[in-house]
Amino acid sequence: MSDRHFVEPDDIESQLFDWGVLKWMSTPEVTGGERFSAGVVKLEPGKGHERHTHPESDEILFVIRGEGEQEVADETRDITAGDMVFIPEGVEHGTLNTGWEPLLLFAVYAPPGPEDVLRDLPECEIVPPGKLPTPENVTEES
């Protein structure tokens, strides 16, 4: 546990997937905050992830840049910079980048936990802090 008040991107490992990159800037291990986790998600153009749920965590997505399509339960909406999406625990959802530039999101889980599930997926590759999130920089532990 830490009590860090300021975190920079180079301080944090990256989770690399074929659809994009995640950097969890606030987790219990990084900042010591126990009630939520938060990070930046970058989805590459035309990429997205399959519908999934977080059985024990609510999720908030805030669109920083880009445009995409967000599914929540049986509703699908176009999203763009400035939009916010609330996904209650256990509700199936998915995100797709429909634009030509990366879709940049700020994601929050409350309580924390789904970020650890993502890290443990076989398709998740870990890039150490301070390294560009590219396949060449993946660590052996992935």
Task: Indicate where each model-derived feature is located.
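A short, N-terminal "cap"/entry segment at the start of jelly-roll beta-barrel domains
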Residues: M1-R35, E50, D120-S142
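Conserved short histidine dyad/triad with adjacent acidic residue
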Residues: K23-W24, G39-H54
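Short, charged/polar surface micro-motifs in flexible loops or helix N-caps
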Residues: V30-E34, E44-G48, E67-E69, P111-E115
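A short hydrophobic beta-strand segment most commonly corresponding to one strand
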Residues: A38-V41, F86, E101-D116
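A generic "binding-loop/recognition-motif" signal
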Residues: K47, E56-S57, E75, V91-E92, ...
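Short beta-strand His + acidic residue motifs that chelate non-heme Fe in jelly-roll/DSBH
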Residues: E50-H52, Q70-E71, I87, H93-G99
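Glycine- and acidic-residue-biased ligand/ion/polar-headgroup-sensing regions
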Residues: E56-D58, F62-G68
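Short acidic-glycine-tyrosine-enriched beta hairpin
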Residues: D74-E89
